[in-house]
Structures are given as C-alpha cells and as structure tokens.
C-alpha cells in the first residue's frame, strides 16, 4: 500500500513526507502466514518482524518473552559476588543517578537485594552539587561506613577516576550501565552493559533500570524461580515500564515486553508511592488503562522534577515507603516541584526563543550552541529538546555558573552527538551520553571554542535538507474500518522505535465547510472514493494554516493523519488527527 509516484513534498510547508521502503512481497507473505491485514503486516515489517512467530511475540508480549539474564556478559560473575555479599551480610551501596531511569533503577535493585536479605544503602547524587556520575568522595565516605561492594546503576561506564578510587579503597565495583562505553573500560570487578564489546545480549537498547532489572532477575530466579516469575517480576515491571518509556529507548524487543507487561500491571498499583503519584497526576487506571503517553507526559516529569529541582532521593523514598501518609506528602512535593519546573522552563524558553529570532548567526548554524547566565542547570536538557523541535538541528544549551559551564545536548536523526563532542573531548571537564543526547561540563572560557569546533563538525555531518515527516503507509479513507483500528491498537505501547502510525490519503475532498474550534483549531469533514464515508479530521493549531490555504467545501487535498478513537459517550467513534495537509494538484 506504500505507492510509488506520490507527492513527496508539501509545498506549503516545505516539509517532505517520507514513506519507508517496504518489501511488499515480504509483507504479503507475513500477512498471509500470520493472518494479518496487509497494512498491519507492512507496519510490522518496518519494525523488523519477519515471521508469524515474531509477529505473535510483537503483538502479544508476555512475561515468558523475557530474555535469559545470563546471556549478558558478566552476569554469572556479578550474581556470584552479590550472593556472597548477602550471605556475609556485607553492606552494599547502590550508586545511581538523579533522573527517572537512575532513581527507578535504585528502587528495583534495592528492593530485590532486601528481599534476598541483603544489607543495602544507596546514593542518588544531587544534580547541582555533584553532577552526573560516580564521585570518589562519595565512595571514600561509603568505605568509611563499612561498604565493601558498590553496584552502580545507570552510571559508571565512563567513570574511570571513581573506579580507580574504588580499587584503592578496597571496594569491589559492579558497573551496571547502558550508556555507550569508551574504547577502554573502567577498572571494575564486573561490568554489565549490553553495549560493551563481546556482549552478545540481543537487546542492545535497554535503559539503565533495564540492566539493573536483569541483575535482579538473575538473583531472584536463583532464589525462588516459581515465585519470582509468578509474582515478583510482574510487580517489578511496573517501575521498569516507567523507566523504559521515560528514557525513550526503542520500544522493541525486550523493551516492548517491559513496557507492555508493566502497563498491564499498573492497572493494579499496589505500592503507596505509585498510588499517590497517580493521584496527583490525575490518573485512575481503574477507569482508564494507562498508556505509554501517560507515563511519558504525566508520570515521568513529576519523577524527574525531584532530581531537576531538589533531591532525587525523595523518589526512592516515595517508591519504597509503606506509609501512605508519607507517600502522599512526597507525591505532593513532586507535583509542586514539577509546577516550579514548568514555570522556570517557560521563562528560560522565552529568553532562548527571543535570541534565536534576533541573532542571524543561529539561522545559519548547522548546530545550535546557546548559553546563558543564571539558567537552571536542571532544565537545560528539556530546553535543548525544545530548541531541536523549533530549529530541526542539533542543539546544546549551556548554563554558565561562575567559571564553569554546564551543558546538555539533543540531536536529530543521522547526527551522532556523542561522536561530535568526543571530537573535542580535551575541552571538557566531564562528558558522556548517547548518539542523541549528551551532558557535559567545561570551563566558561572554552565555550566559544566548543561552538566553533562543533560548527565545523556539523558542516561535515548535518545535511541541508527540507524538514521531513516520517509517514508509515498509505491508507485511503474508504478503507478505514473498526476492525482495522482494532488491529492497529495491538501495536501499543507506542513510543520511540514503535511510533504511532501516520497514514497518507491522497485526493481527499472536503464535504462540509471548515468548522472552527476555539479560534486556533479546526474540524474538517473529509471523504474519499465514490461512496466513501465522511470522517471528522481534527487540526490542532491548524486554524491559521487552513485559512491561508483557502480551504472550503469541495477543496481536494492530500492529508497525512493519525487514526484516533473518541471516547465521548454521545459523539464517540473513530476520527482523524491531521499531521499535515497540502492542496492536491
């Protein structure tokens, strides 16, 4: 159904509509063997599904689809050392991070170790005072308190100095991390990272909590296999689903199992902390099942607010306390911190937008580097994402604090941001990250040199091209049915790597006058085919564009759209959400 010869560019927005190069023969074979509608088979083929068995795993993810934790390099050695620490009642320190991934990883591993009888302490670093990564000073204090085993979660793979400090202090170090390793690895007893050279673990895109979960899974299954699989792991997946969605790892492979089973388990939030957090986020899974969107935009920001605006250890307490009143207090605090974060973000974004519009240098830059005094260091990552959304180019936002500059960067598809900053690594005090996101610090006087060198790198690696929108398939409006929508729902949970499908319909006519909704929005009635039914198509923030296009009853357009279900008791049913639209012809 991905027809060739279709219009590729929206002339009104200069936005290219890009369709994947689907193997139609393979999709047809998959549709027949798995009993799928052809368009669903096409969507699955785009996601790497090749057989009926793989289609069943994708469409019906279950707990038994979890991978063997011992397939991860180093797992046997890690389990042996942790079991010895538990048996000997050694004090174990879990060293995490301050974001959703890092704090939930602490909760998962701490809960597992304490279930097994371990003596556990944890450290969630303060974003402003300590920054990202393990610090030698913290390890020194831990050793003085009797710690003999340190397990890092969502951090450690590039913490060479801290690893050396651990060795000098006589601490055994197990690094569990998902960030891309350097060519060299830190000195540690064991490293668990699916991305390290020689590791054959099938799912390379686990989040940090995912790696910590695999260690917990191996330990718990060795303790009581039946109980672990029947009760413990499903419960753990509630927390892991939040981390997996929040860290924007691809929702494919084992991550899809984490997210899908975890969302199902979240229908019954047993812990006081989860119940309280859902309450302040105004989510009731008893009335409506949670979605990945709920986790990404309603739950994760409140958890992240603790590390951005205050202390991340509040998150660990929230999810481990059994005191309902205390859980309510902590959830209310996270909700308040999230509101403060939103206000600070809006004020900083206004400054950035003004500078981007006033300074012509930014318009010509292939990579945006923008810095400011007094910017809140806990919010610069969000702001970098906002700049990427606006400029469609890699962006680094830097907060200047005295003589030190703290930065966060986000990228665009095809531009490996970590490789870019590795090309000028001598400028940094510290740095790390992924292909699409980085964090770093450097002396203020080196910011201009960083800007110059990143611009030179970007000139070679960022293509000048019209902004593009990935569409997934051609779906004429007269082929939409309730049955097809039911099949499409099985693609959930949706997210990175398994995006909500955007369909294209060509030569669609408006069957009624444009109906405005609250000034900024519109509702169009669209139909296709000689006897095609008319569909409501909602255009959020489309009022000005529809007016500029001069659309009226009888106009013929090409439309890129998402398929939605309106749950309104009186006006419910399927409807379209406009992603883009262009006049036909």
Regions found by a protein language model. Give the residues of each.
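Conserved beta-strand positions in the Rossmann-like core of class I SAM-dependent methyltransferases
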Residues: 121, 174, 549
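Mid-to-C-terminal polyanion-binding domains and interfaces
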Residues: 10, 84-88, 326-370, 415, ...
């Amino acid at each position: 159904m991905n027809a060739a010869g279709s219009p590729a560019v929206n002339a009104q927005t200069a936005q290219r509509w890009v369709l994947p190069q689907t193997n139609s023969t393979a999709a047809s074979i998959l549709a027949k063997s798995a009993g799928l509608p052809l368009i669903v088979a096409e969507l699955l083929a785009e996601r790497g599904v090749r057989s009926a068995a793989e289609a069943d795993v994708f469409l019906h993810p279950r707990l038994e689809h979890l991978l063997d934790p011992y397939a991860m390099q180093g797992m046997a050695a890690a389990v042996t050392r942790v079991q010895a620490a538990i048996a000997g009642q050694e004090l174990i320190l879990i060293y995490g991070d301050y974001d959703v991934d890092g704090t939930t990883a602490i909760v998962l591993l701490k809960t597992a170790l304490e279930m097994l009888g371990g003596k556990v302490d944890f450290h969630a670093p303060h974003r402003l005072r300590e920054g990202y990564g393990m610090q030698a000073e913290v390890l020194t204090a831990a050793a003085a308190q009797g710690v003999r085993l340190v397990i890092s979660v969502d951090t450690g793979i590039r913490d060479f100095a801290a690893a050396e400090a651990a060795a000098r202090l006589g601490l055994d170090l197990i690094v569990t991390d998902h960030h891309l390793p350097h060519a060299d690895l830190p000195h540690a007893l064991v490293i668990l990272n699916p991305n390290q050279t020689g590791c054959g673990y099938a799912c390379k895109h686990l989040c940090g909590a995912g790696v910590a979960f695999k260690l917990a899974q191996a330990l718990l299954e060795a303790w009581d296999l039946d109980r672990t699989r029947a009760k413990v792991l499903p419960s753990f997946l509630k927390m892991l689903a939040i981390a997996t969605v929040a860290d924007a790892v691809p929702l494919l492979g084992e991550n899809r199992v984490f997210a899908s089973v975890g969302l199902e388990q979240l229908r019954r939030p047993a812990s006081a902390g989860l119940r309280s957090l859902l309450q302040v986020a105004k989510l009731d899974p008893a009335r409506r099942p949670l979605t990945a969107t709920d986790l990404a935009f309603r739950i994760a920001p409140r958890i992240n607010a603790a590390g951005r605006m205050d202390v991340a250890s509040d998150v660990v307490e929230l999810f481990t306390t059994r005191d309902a009143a205390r859980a309510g207090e902590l959830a209310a605090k996270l909700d308040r911190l999230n509101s403060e974060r939103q206000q600070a973000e809006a004020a900083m974004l206004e400054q950035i937008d003004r500078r981007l519009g006033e300074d012509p240098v930014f318009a010509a830059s292939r990579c945006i580097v923008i810095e400011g005094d007094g910017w809140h260091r806990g919010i610069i990552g969000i702001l970098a994402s906002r700049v990427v959304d606006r400029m469609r180019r890699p962006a680094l936002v830097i907060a200047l604090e005295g003589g030190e500059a703290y930065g966060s960067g986000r990228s665009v598809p095809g531009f490996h941001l970590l490789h870019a900053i590795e090309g000028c690594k001598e400028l940094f005090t510290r740095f790390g990250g992924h292909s699409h996101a980085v964090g770093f610090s450097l002396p203020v006087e080196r910011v201009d040199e960083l800007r110059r060198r990143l611009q030179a790198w970007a000139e070679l690696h960022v293509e000048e091209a019209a902004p593009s929108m990935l569409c997934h398939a051609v779906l004429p409006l007269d082929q939409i049915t309730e049955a097809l929508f039911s099949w499409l729902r099985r693609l959930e949970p949706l997210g990175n790597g398994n995006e909500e499908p955007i369909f294209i319909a060509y030569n669609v006519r408006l069957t009624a006058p444009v109906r405005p909704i609250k000034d900024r929005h519109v509702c169009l009635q669209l139909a296709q085919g000689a006897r095609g039914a008319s569909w409501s198509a909602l255009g959020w923030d489309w009022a000005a564009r529809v007016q500029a296009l001069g659309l009226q009853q009888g106009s013929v357009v090409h439309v890129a759209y998402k398929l939605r279900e309106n749950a309104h008791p009186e006006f419910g049913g399927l409807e379209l959400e406009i992603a883009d639209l262009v006049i036909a012809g």
